[in-house]
Each structure stands twice: as C-alpha cells, then as structure tokens.
Amino acid sequence: MPNQRPLYIPFSGPALLETPLLNKGSAFSSEERDSFNLTGLLPHNIETIEEQSLRAYHQLRSFTTDIDKHIYLRNIQDTNETLFHHLIEQHIEEVMPLIYTPTVGQACEKFSQIYRRKRGLFISYPDRHKIDDMLQNATKQKVKVIVVTDGERILGLGDQGIGGMGIPIGKLALYTACGGISPAYCLPILLDVGTNNQQLLDDPMYMGWRNQRISGDEYNEFVDLFIQAVKRRWPEVLLQFEDFAQENATPLLNRYRDQLCCFNDDIQGTAAVSVGTLIAACLNKGQKLSQQKIAFLGAGSAGCGIAEHIIRQMQREGLTEEQARKQVFMVDRYGLLTDSMTELQKFQAPLVQKESAIESWDKSQKLGLAQVVKQAKITVLFGVSGQKGLFTREVIEALCVNTEHPIVLPLSNPTSRVEATPQEVTSWSRGKAIVATGSPFPNTTFEDQSFEISQCNNSYIFPGIGLGVLAAHATGISDNMLMSASQALADISMEYEKAPGAILPPIKFIREISEKIAYAVALQAIEDKLALPVTAENLERRLKANFWLPRYHNYRRTSF
C-alpha cells in the first residue's frame, strides 16, 4: 500500500521521470499519469513496487560478475531511489555486499570507466572559492547527513582520487537501507585535492583534477573552507569523515568535533562495532572483555581508535587506565610499539608498551606478531593492517596455547587484503577460534562442523548512530555515545538465536538492530547534555518518525 499522506509535486513529464527521489516508473497511477503529463511516456500496465522489484531482481541475477551487478544497482538508484531501496529491503543479505564492501572497492578503482550519472557534489581545489555556490547547487536542499572523503585511503586500496566517491555513495545507501534515514536527506561529497596515484594521472579517462595531491597548509585551509561553508549551509548536519589518510584523519576529527556534529567512521565507527563485537564474543565464552590480552596487527588510526575504545570499555568493567593499557599490544611492520621508539604518530604514543614492562621477554628475535602472541599470552587478535596473509599458522596455533577459544578478528577490507581467511583460522585452530571479519565470507568447516562467520562491519553501528543523532537532535557525538552503541550491539546480539560460530545477529535484522542502537545513542546524547531532554515515549516517536521506508506516496500536482 502506498503511504496515505499525498505529496504535492511541482514536476511533470520527463522532468518527473528524471528525478530519482520522485520517479515511480510504471507504478504511476492512471490519475497521476494524466495529472503529471505522463500518458504515453510509460507502458500501459500499472505495476506495484513489489512487481517492479521482482523484475529488477530477475535482471540483477542475470549479471554474472559482482561489479556488473553493482553498476546495475547504481543505475536503479540513479533512476528510481525508492525502488532501489525496496530491492535492498527484500534481498539485503545478497545485495549489501554488492552496493558496499567488498564490491565497492572495484567500483572505486573503475569509477571513471563506469561513471554514468552525477550523484552528490565534487568539490575540487581549483574551485575552492566557489564552495558556497556548490552547496547551493546541491539537488537536495534539506540535507541532514553528509559523508565526505578526499579519496586518499580507500578501504585497503590506497589513493583512488575521485574514485573515492564510491564510498560516500555506498555509505549513504546503507544509512538508508539499515538506518532508515531518508535518501532525500543524504548527500555524498568528494573533496578533489588531486591524486598521487600515477596510474590515475596517466589514465585518459580519469575525471578528477589531474594534479599531485595538495598537502600541509594548503590542504588544511581547503578543508576548513569546506567545513565553514557546510556550517553556514546546514548548521545542524551530521558530517561523517570517510577514508582520509591517517595523517589527516585524527587531526581533522579533533579539530572539528566541537565545531559541528561530526565523526570519523574509520576511527570511531570501526572502534564502536569492533568493541561491540568483541564484548559479544567474550560473552559467548562466558568472559569479560577486561579479562583479555589483546594484540593488534596494524597501528594506524583505525587500529589505535579501536584500542582506545577497548581501553575505555575495560575501565567501564573496573580496570584502571594503567591496568587496561598494559593489556593492549600494538604491532606494526617494525614490531611491537614500545616507548623506546622514535617518530611515532601522536595517536600511537599513548598505546606503546613500556620497555620496563617487557624486560623479562626473550628478545633474541624481533618482537613481531608471533613473538608478541607467545610472550604476552594474547587471547584476542585484531587485523587492521590491510596486508594479506599476515596471520600465519604459527600465530593462530600460538593463540590456541594461550586460551581454549581465541577471538580472531581479521578486519581489513576488501577481501583481497584480509590477514587470514576464516577457513584458514578455523582449520589452524581446529575449530576452536571465534572469528569475525570486516567483509562477508562463506561459512567455514572443520571435520563435521560448520561455522557461520559474522561480519564485523561498520554497517551494524553507523546507521544506528546517525538515526539516534537525528532523533535526539544531538549537537555532537561523544565517546560515551559510541560506548553506548557498542554495548547496545553486544546486548542485542545476545537476544537473537544465532548459528554456530556467529557472534552478531544476521544482517537481515539490521533495521531492528539500528533502531535499538539509535535509542541507546539518543539516550546517551541527552545524558551527556548534547541534546535536550525528552521523554522515552517522545524519543521512540521521533525514531519512528525519522525511519523512512521505501514505499510510494500518492502524488498531487502543485505549482512551483
């Protein structure tokens, strides 16, 4: 059934059919076809959205490669946004990997080759004095959520230049599909500051600014011009930083998190979903997170963000900060981070181990991952290195000496960059490891047992955070709000019946999960005085009011 309240539309004829947010295609009624000058522009038969979705699904299944399926889905999105999201709703477990990870990585690499139609805003450095005009040019005027990238660190693929736009487009599709935020309120933005990817610069089809990346003061001043323009245009917007290089990600977040409601999904979203997954995994084996010894392979902004979030959770569970930091070990390509190292990043410094604390260790070999796992008695292993195959049999077998059920989280995206496949971890641990990954993987087997692999993907968290922020009218996102999101995810995970091996609920329940996380986030925003007080009843009403469903409205004709 279409929504009961009609929409009053000033567009008609081909202009209406060319407006993705309003186009209904063959579902326009006879009255609408007459009223909006559509008679003869569409086939005679009037269809329901269910019938349209069935046809679209059959067409989708006719493609043989994931990238072709991605292109097809993006074409639907750019033609009929309601149908696009109805199709996702009906087949979310099958379609999510096609619109986001892992397929979106290929789409970013081939962005200029597969480009079809404009979506979002491309704000280039040469046009930096026109940013206010560009924001006015946006086809969506009531923007509530922006996802912005500069394309420098796309997934594990590095600098993709203008191709990075695939990430904001995909992320915002998930804000709608998982968090119920209307696509009318979502705006993807690409900051085109050049690229250092010579392959792109040499590509005759590359559509971005052909220049080496700007950096330093030039870069910071450009980003500031953008942020100030956004504040003028949409002062209450939620802005998500996405896939910025680690030397820019943390400084930008720290600089602007008190100026507007913003967060960095790579740092904070990844941390929140990782800690929520880890709490749930610990509950699965009857333990607390604070009982674990945790090692990270990869000490970039994402890994360090997760580590700091873990330390805060350990403090919530009763440890002192000093005790918690002694239980977290960061390993990069140079080995274990210690206080004897120089040239550490600012965000890495608080996470080093003191040399005095490890003076009894055997240091005849480099303190790489295997040595750290053995000597620190590690029970939880995170992979955020973006490097394939670094979780070796030796490492996994050493984990199994330390604990009966080690928790192994190879989170690097896309699947081509994962530290170990779930099947490798399951086999090497003889079915004992509890595993979750950043991208989707098939079930694993050991002997006669089958294990489902949960996807520790930010899509479990950021849509709920966004919905909670909008429902509460929050002016910022605090660490406590992120902690509440993590705890809510873990608590929710205990409510659902799960297959053997699974840590998180099936993705088909993602909308229910997002609503519950949104409620927890909104309550915490009120407690942190980042939102005005509201009764529980009114908060639930706001959440329902903000939750958009892909259904057609009846249209009425009006003038501009």
Curated annotation (Swiss-Prot):
NAD(+) binds at residues 153, 266, 413. It comes from the Bacteria. GO terms for molecular function: malate dehydrogenase (decarboxylating) (NAD+) activity; metal ion binding; NAD binding; oxaloacetate decarboxylase activity. InterPro entries: Aminoacid_DH-like_N_sf, Malic_enzyme_CS, Malic_N_dom, Malic_N_dom_sf, Malic_NAD-bd, Malic_OxRdtase, NAD(P)-bd_dom_sf, NAD_malic_enz_proteobac. It catalyses: (S)-malate + NAD(+) = pyruvate + CO2 + NADH; oxaloacetate + H(+) = pyruvate + CO2. Its cofactor is Mg(2+); Mn(2+). Divalent metal cations. Prefers magnesium or manganese. Keywords: Metal-binding, NAD, Oxidoreductase. The active site is at 100 (proton donor), 171 (proton acceptor). The record marks 266 as: Important for activity. GO terms for biological process: malate metabolic process. Its EC number is 1.1.1.38. Disulfide bonds: none annotated. GO terms for cellular component: cytosol. A divalent metal cation binds at residues 242-243, 266. SMART domains: malic, Malic_M. NCBIfam families: PRK13529.1. PANTHER family: MALIC ENZYME-RELATED (PTHR23406), NAD-DEPENDENT MALIC ENZYME, MITOCHONDRIAL (PTHR23406:SF34). Belongs to the malic enzymes family. Homotetramer. This is NAD-dependent malic enzyme. It comes from Psychrobacter arcticus (strain DSM 17307 / VKM B-2377 / 273-4). The gene is maeA.
